[in-house]
Amino acid sequence: MHSPLEIARNYIEVGIHKVNLSIFKTILLGFFAGMFIGFAGIASTTASSTIGIASVAKLVGAAVFPAGMAMVLVAGSELFTGNNLIILAVLEKKVTVWKMLKNWLFVYIGNFLGAAFVAVLVVVGRTPDLFGEQLAQAIVNAATARTNLSVGEAFVRGILCNILVCIAVWMSFAAKRVSGKLLTSYWPVMLFVLCGFEHSIADMYFGVCGLLTAQAYGITAESLTWFNFLVKALLPITLGNIVGGAGIVGCGYWLAYLHRTPYSADTTAAEQEEIDIAEEY
């Protein structure tokens, strides 16, 4: 297992690699991550849609959703929320703020396209027909729950969510084997879903799928509009994710492990030999 200091140093190299990807590769890998999270979203809703006890339904959905993060970490993709940790490389002056923001933008675009792609295919494929169209109602309810949040609530839930998501990514870097990555990343992701915190990329899927399902199945949901989804929900959730991931986890761990202990490729060569950075992609 890698120590927290090794994880921090490793992520500097990972951050350098990420920001130097071409725009095409960044968007393409972002598309894959968006799809993976979208698959987790529909699976989570399907698993919990017919369970009458709300807390049990929430637990079942939370138990299923981490499959999306597992695919992101192991299959190779770029997830906006996890990439908030690039701030470590910025604070170490190995990456410019501009390059980090550019990466975030194109990954975010790719994530949206991937999540929306899954949402469209779910509706076109009539997946919401399951369980006598109970799944259709559950999909719309999931989207409406997000658009019913106040801007402040959405922002705070976004902060809480990405603290856990970035901790999941951080913990996965401690593992040297795939099994370890899956096990360590599972619990923080399960917790954020169970607690009802908001993940911007997951909400891209939930929002688009909810809007399309409501239209296709004639389900009325007054608060479920494109404006409410994009501006009232997704925007503050995204900003909250940045605060939680880059501000709290990224800056916090930089202060704990790297501040006044600058990264040096020469002094940590032996440590870096043990870390297979390529497996993160």
Q: Where is each model-derived feature located?
A:
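Alpha-helical transmembrane segments and their helix-helix packing motifs
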Residues: M1-Y281
